[in-house]
């Protein structure tokens, strides 16, 4: 019987995607993310509330490696990667790293237990790729395979981004997705009526994962995925730019975003913890955007900015 090695790491929620990607690059065959924020006040697929849990700033990420892999080398690689993240001022919190062996049949199903279909917005439901799910009238289904990296698409920062896209997209727009990760925001943009979507990520793993997830979904031939360093060097204008990435990186996006967003277009920024909200907001205001909407879930913030000279309906900076 082939066995697997299960490695579990507990980190601050802000570092979830960066650490998930690190585990994949170290050779993981899949990751599962357990975040209490995904369950606070949420109903499961049967309409029942999940048991009451105390929300924590920490998330638990479980990765799976073949039994033949040298777990000591893997731990060393991961620790080196974590050190690099610390140097980039990524909030990691109090780290915990453990590992154990897991039988083949346990590995095949263990991480799937974390993932149920989830109605995220009025129109959008995220469904795991292996689940048979019948959509109701008007319900738009996003199919994802979370067994790779970048979580399940139900993290508060992703939810806020999806709410924002649902708010600004009316059909026929060009959208740029910065730091696409799983590709969930690009898929959602297409389902919500965008004419064309351009998805970029600096990481080759993310580009592959996004392409694989997009292939799981219908009517997504209009999504173009490529490697790219934020918005640097791009000339393609867009009606909407969405960026769900670390706050410290968002501040470097605003100037290029203003250059690329069409007049009366939108910049959506998510992934912002409350303590860094003013920093991100000021960067966008300095670039020339006007703040239209501020959304909050727990400690996470999303901002919708507009490129306009019309001050009506705009929140004061």
Swiss-Prot record:
Alphabetical list of Gene3D superfamilies matching this protein: Vaccinia Virus protein VP39
GO molecular function: protein-lysine N-methyltransferase activity
TM regions (residue ranges): none
Enzymatic class: transferase
Any one GO cellular component localisation term in the record: cytoplasm
Keywords, comma-separated and alphabetical: Cytoplasm, Methyltransferase, S-adenosyl-L-methionine, Transferase
EC number annotated for this UniProt entry: 2.1.1.-
GO biological process terms, semicolon-separated: methylation
Keyword check for Repeat: no
Catalytic activity: L-lysyl-[protein] + 3 S-adenosyl-L-methionine = N(6),N(6),N(6)-trimethyl-L-lysyl-[protein] + 3 S-adenosyl-L-homocysteine + 3 H(+)
UniProt: S-adenosyl-L-methionine binding residues: 158, 179, 201, 244
Location(s), subcellular: Cytoplasm
Signal sequence annotation: none
Cited HAMAP family: Methyltr_PrmA
Its biological purpose: Methylates ribosomal protein L11.
Name this polypeptide is given: Ribosomal protein L11 methyltransferase
Organism name: Streptococcus equi subsp. zooepidemicus (strain H70)
Lineage: Bacteria, Bacillati, Bacillota, Bacilli, Lactobacillales
Gene from which the chain derives: prmA
